[in-house]
């Protein structure tokens, strides 16, 4: 019989051979392991909620009729004819209830002697370690840290996911010698026999035997490790030799845990084995045991010794555990790696105090792994809190701190701890400003703006803030007058300059716009204050009560009886309700319907925070549209979340309370005006992509629209709201193996806000945001008419384009508001207290209440965005590129460089071409650029214009590689005068080495392009040459070296004449237009060409055109 249980050696002086087995069974002291007789279908461990079912249905669901579920004891001993004995599970302590996840093994374990330190490939830690900080960082990972996330039963129901690799060394080492470190004997005991039912379809016996062999080693090592740790703790010894001995044993145990996990999850094995391996992992809680017994147990011991020990042991152990677990992630399915990502963040955070940042930056490691886990784990307050302690971006850290106290599983720090972390976040931003000022003035200024914002935001969380009127006034004035202004006095929120802002400012406020919105919302909802009206609406007390009950259940798990909680009466008095919030004695499963509770909750709201939040929102509504939308969309979803929660309220009085609250608080006049401006702006920029987006979603109702985006989210600012308690009203998130995200690129967004990616650069995501904002407003107006927001189809929408049909749906879509009536739903003056507390934020203009009035064209009354300086249609043009054709970031949204040069662009009515002087003016260049780009999008058959660029010799010398790439990708068509080619050949004999090299490479490039038929050689006469190496004409024209420019210009003129003559012939009447353009940066040559009526452009224009065509075709042209 093959028995999983390991034989014990009663003699501690003898070596223990883990590779041998006999009929003796070792007594199991692990709370996670079975310890008495049990049947296969017995009830699982009673202390965890996921073990309430008698058996797992995973195997039956995944492969019906093939593999029955396994019970505890399955791998304790299996043969073809015998069933091994197995113990019944016993009650576990707090340490045993941990999450169940799986991972990979280290290929080698450092050899450790009791008389010396282990020879690991890591440097020693510095001796000046702050031991107090070490103890504090180790303390945060306690034995009950991960119990809340453990749910192996749930994971068993998930689909099978293939791992990314194969563990190549799944065989355990046959012998492990530990006699040199043994201190306490392992007591042997024989469990009673047990009869149980085997699966109907037997898994591979080799597979089971392999797991049994590994498990035998694990059982003995677990027992011995716990006994040695207990002995070391109770003996109060400070001998480092004992610590290193336990270290050696612990690293071997970690190796075997991971070996077991990898073997069980090996995806190349038969499906029956794979399913069985997953079941075994869950039932035997191997992953929990790896974390609890393999890592946390020893760290607890080290924590107790942190004040008088060399930190080398702790350093080595954390690094070993980190490397082992991180390697394991490569070889296991994603669903088994999610929580291990969070644990890698924990290990990194514990190591921060052990090494200085210049040596190993564990802070960056912790932030990375916490960020990785946040892609799949939502609503975990402890995770948000932990990343807030290590995050580099101070604003994002502040937001995550706010989310940690306002989510499904809220973190509940003391007020002192919360204030301390807020102070640390502010100090971190201050340090960043000091370091940035020495390197970059722009970065230093941005950091200063961020510090000012955080300073005035965080001060509102001080307990004394509400009592200090002067401080409230200072904070209010900052958000009203100073927020958004730089050191030069430029205001990014100045509406008149919305199309000529500094692109750097646009990108900065774009990236941080969602974080500004989230931080203000977290202030608005009380930053974790459960008595705040928003906290009551989103039921924060309910989740605080669940958190408390879970903690108490752990403490009182010795008793089988569960405590009964009386349901709370939603009509109870206000005083009793708030007293219960303090005590958390009753449940809060329902939203209160007693109006007095809501009126009294106004006493627990920070009115200054409301005013500051609305000031910031109003500023963003007046900002450049690309900056306004990420901020505005966050607020729109917050409004939708409130309205969806109100659908659950059965009291008309409470609904009326919130409707009046929203009508008085939100800047509805600016919101409606911005919605109408977006409609006009979309009409002026209507193009196929925008049309497709509108037609795809226009007919959807609000619920359908939200449901679609919940499963196909493509905006990072909305994804960042996932997990907050208020967003749970829209999409409730927990742990998701495959999040409902359409654009996974924003998972890789920078630490400094959301990413401004390629789709933002070309305006694609701008139109996605615009469409969503307009349709969300439309959906709110239709689904919640009591809010006062209306959609009118009676008013005409301003449109400057004649090519849009008059019956197009956008031309009749306008947003309007009902006049606000305080007496509505207030028959008995019940809401007078609300009116006294909340003032009306913004008066509604008459144009926004008249359903037939043409809406405003700007959020500033009486103005029009089409008349603002720098207004252009949103499309990449010539001015969005630099001299090398590189795309200038954010220039599509701003004409800042042109306005700075005294140029005002208005493309609404310019002429295309100035025939008199043949000058490609700025206006003509833009339209010519767009027309050529548009013509080049199709295939050769659809071209209505074929353009050949003829490049002079100087441009060839400077840009031959760039030209080669454009021609090689068929992005543009090129021709070359034989004169230019001969000049380049001649320059190979120059005395300047740089010229010689450039000329040589140019000649090679031209020959290669000619061989690939990517360039057309052109004679003096304008005819096409038979070969690029022709030289007959040069022999006849001996003066060509002194008249190169004239020969080139004359050849282009004759070529264009030839093209024109060919179009006039009968057989070529349907042929597309062809002409040649000279490309030169030489002003003299440029003027000579214009005198001959030849179109010219510079290399910047050429490369800009190539870049735009490359964007359209998905090609790299530089």
UniProtKB/Swiss-Prot annotation:
The chain positions of domain PINc read 947-1087
User: Which InterPro entries does this entry report, sorted A to Z?
Assistant: Est1/Ebs1-like, PIN_dom, TPR-like_helical_dom_sf
Q: Where is this region: Disordered?
A: 1-62, 77-119
Q: Which SMART domains match?
A: PINc
What is a single cellular component term in the Gene Ontology annotation?
telomerase holoenzyme complex
What does this protein do, in the record's words? May be involved in the regulation of gene expression responses of environment-sensing pathways.
Q: What is this protein called?
A: EST/SMG-like protein 1
Give the taxonomic lineage as stored in the record: Eukaryota, Fungi, Dikarya, Ascomycota, Saccharomycotina
Q: Which gene encodes it?
A: ESL1
């Amino acid at each position: 019989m093959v028995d999983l249980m390991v034989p014990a050696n009663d003699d501690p002086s003898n070596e223990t051979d883990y590779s041998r087995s006999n009929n003796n069974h070792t007594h199991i002291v692990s709370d996670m392991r079975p310890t008495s007789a049990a049947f296969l279908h017995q009830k699982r461990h009673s202390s965890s909620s996921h073990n309430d079912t008698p058996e797992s249905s995973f195997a039956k669901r995944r492969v019906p009729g093939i593999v029955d579920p396994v019970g505890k004891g399955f791998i304790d001993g299996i043969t073809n004819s015998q069933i091994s004995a197995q113990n019944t599970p016993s009650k576990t302590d707090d340490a045993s209830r941990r999450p169940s996840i799986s991972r990979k093994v280290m290929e080698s374990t450092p050899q450790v002697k009791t008389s010396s330190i282990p020879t690991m490939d890591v440097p020693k830690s510095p001796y000046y370690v702050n031991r107090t900080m070490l103890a504090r960082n180790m303390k945060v990972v306690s034995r009950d840290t991960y119990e809340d996330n453990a749910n192996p039963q749930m994971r068993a129901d998930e689909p099978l996911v293939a791992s990314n690799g194969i563990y190549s060394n799944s065989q355990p080492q046959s012998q492990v010698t530990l006699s040199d470190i043994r201190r306490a004997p392992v007591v042997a005991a024989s469990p009673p026999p047990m009869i149980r039912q085997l699966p109907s379809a037997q898994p591979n016996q080799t597979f089971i035997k392999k797991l049994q062999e590994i498990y035998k080693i694990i059982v003995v090592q677990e027992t011995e490790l716990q006994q040695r740790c207990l002995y070391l703790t109770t003996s109060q010894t400070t001998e480092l030799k004992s610590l290193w001995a336990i270290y050696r044993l612990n690293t071997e145990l970690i190796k075997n845990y991971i070996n077991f996990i990898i073997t069980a999850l090996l995806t190349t094995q038969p499906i029956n084995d794979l399913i069985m391996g997953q079941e075994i992992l869950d039932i035997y809680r191997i992953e929990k045991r790896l974390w609890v017994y393999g890592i946390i147990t020893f760290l607890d011991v080290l924590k107790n010794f942190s004040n008088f020990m060399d930190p080398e042991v702790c350093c080595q152990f954390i690094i070993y555990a980190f490397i082992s677990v991180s390697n394991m992630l490569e070889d296991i399915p994603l669903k088994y790696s999610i929580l291990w990502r969070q644990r890698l963040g924990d290990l990194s955070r514990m190591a921060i105090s052990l090494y200085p940042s210049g040596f190993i930056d564990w802070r960056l490691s912790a932030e990375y792994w916490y960020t990785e886990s946040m892609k799949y784990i939502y609503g975990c307050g402890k995770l948000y809190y932990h990343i807030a302690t290590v995050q580099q971006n101070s604003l994002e850290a502040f937001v995550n701190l706010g989310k940690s106290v306002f989510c499904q599983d809220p973190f509940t720090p003391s007020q002192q701890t919360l204030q301390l972390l807020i102070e640390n976040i502010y100090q971190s931003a201050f340090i960043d400003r000091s370091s940035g000022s020495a390197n970059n003035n722009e970065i230093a200024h941005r950091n200063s703006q961020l510090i000012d914002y955080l300073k005035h935001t965080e001060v509102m969380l001080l307990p004394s803030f509400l009592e200090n009127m002067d401080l409230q006034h200072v904070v209010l004035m900052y958000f009203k007058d100073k927020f958004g202004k730089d050191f030069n006095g430029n205001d990014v929120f100045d509406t008149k300059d919305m199309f000529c802002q500094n692109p750097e400012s646009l990108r900065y406020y774009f990236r941080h716009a969602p974080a500004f919105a989230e931080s203000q919302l977290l202030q608005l909802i009380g930053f974790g204050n459960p008595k705040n009206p928003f906290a009551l609406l989103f039921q924060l007390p309910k989740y605080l009560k669940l958190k408390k009950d879970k903690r108490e259940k752990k403490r009182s798990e010795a008793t089988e009886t569960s405590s009964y909680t009386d349901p709370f009466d939603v009509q109870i008095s206000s005083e009793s309700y708030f007293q219960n919030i303090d005590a958390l004695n009753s449940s809060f499963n329902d939203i209160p319907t007693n109006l007095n509770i809501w009126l009294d909750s106004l006493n627990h709201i920070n009115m200054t925070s409301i005013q500051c939040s609305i000031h910031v929102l109003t500023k963003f509504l007046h900002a450049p549209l690309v900056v306004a939308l990420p901020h505005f969309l966050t607020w729109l979803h917050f409004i939708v979340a409130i309205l969806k929660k109100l659908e659950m309220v059965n009291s008309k009085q409470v609904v009326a309370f919130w409707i009046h609250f929203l009508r008085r608080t939100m800047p509805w006049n600016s919101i409606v005006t911005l919605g109408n401006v977006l409609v006009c702006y979309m009409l002026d920029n209507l193009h196929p992509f925008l049309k497709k987006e509108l037609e795809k979603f226009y007919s959807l109702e609000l619920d359908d629209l939200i449901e679609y985006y919940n499963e196909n989210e493509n905006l990072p600012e909305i994804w960042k709201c996932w997990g907050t308690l208020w967003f749970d009203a829209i999409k409730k998130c927990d742990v998701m193996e495959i999040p409902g995200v359409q654009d996974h690129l924003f998972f890789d967004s920078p630490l400094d806000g959301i990413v401004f990616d390629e789709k933002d650069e070309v305006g694609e995501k701008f139109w996605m945001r615009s469409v969503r904002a307009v349709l969300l407003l439309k959906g709110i107006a239709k689904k919640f008419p009591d809010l006062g927001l209306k959609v009118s189809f009676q008013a005409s929408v301003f449109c400057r384009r004649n090519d849009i049909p008059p019956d197009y749906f956008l031309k009749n879509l306008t947003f309007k508001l009902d006049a606000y009536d305080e007496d509505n739903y207030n028959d008995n003056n019940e809401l007078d207290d609300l009116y006294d507390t909340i003032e009306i934020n913004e008066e509604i203009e008459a144009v926004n209440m008249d359903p037939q009035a043409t809406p405003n064209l700007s959020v500033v009354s009486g103005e029009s965005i089409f008349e603002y300086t720098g207004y252009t249609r949103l499309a990449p043009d010539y001015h969005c590129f630099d001299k090398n054709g590189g795309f200038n970031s954010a220039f599509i949204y701003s004409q800042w460089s042109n306005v700075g040069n005294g140029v005002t662009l208005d493309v609404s009515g310019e002429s295309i071409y100035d025939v008199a002087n043949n000058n490609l003016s700025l206006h003509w260049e833009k339209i010519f650029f767009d027309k050529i780009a548009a013509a080049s999008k199709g295939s050769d058959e659809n071209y209505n214009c074929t353009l050949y660029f003829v490049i002079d010799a100087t441009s060839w010398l400077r840009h031959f590689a760039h030209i080669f790439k454009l021609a090689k990708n068929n992005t543009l068509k090129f021709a070359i005068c034989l004169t230019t080619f001969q000049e380049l050949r001649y320059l190979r004999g120059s005395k300047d080495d740089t010229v010689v090299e450039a000329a040589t490479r140019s000649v090679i490039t031209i020959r290669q392009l000619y061989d690939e038929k990517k360039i057309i050689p052109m004679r003096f006469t304008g005819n096409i040459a038979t070969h690029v190496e022709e030289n007959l004409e040069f022999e006849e024209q001996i003066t060509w070296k002194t008249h190169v420019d004239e020969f080139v210009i004359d050849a282009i003129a004759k070529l264009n004449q030839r093209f024109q003559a060919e179009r006039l012939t009968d057989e070529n009447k349907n042929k597309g237009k062809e002409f040649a353009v000279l490309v030169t940066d030489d002003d003299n040559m440029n003027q000579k060409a214009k005198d001959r009526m030849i179109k010219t452009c510079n290399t910047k224009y050429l490369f800009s055109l190539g870049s735009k065509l490359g964007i359209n075709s998905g090609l790299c042209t530089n």
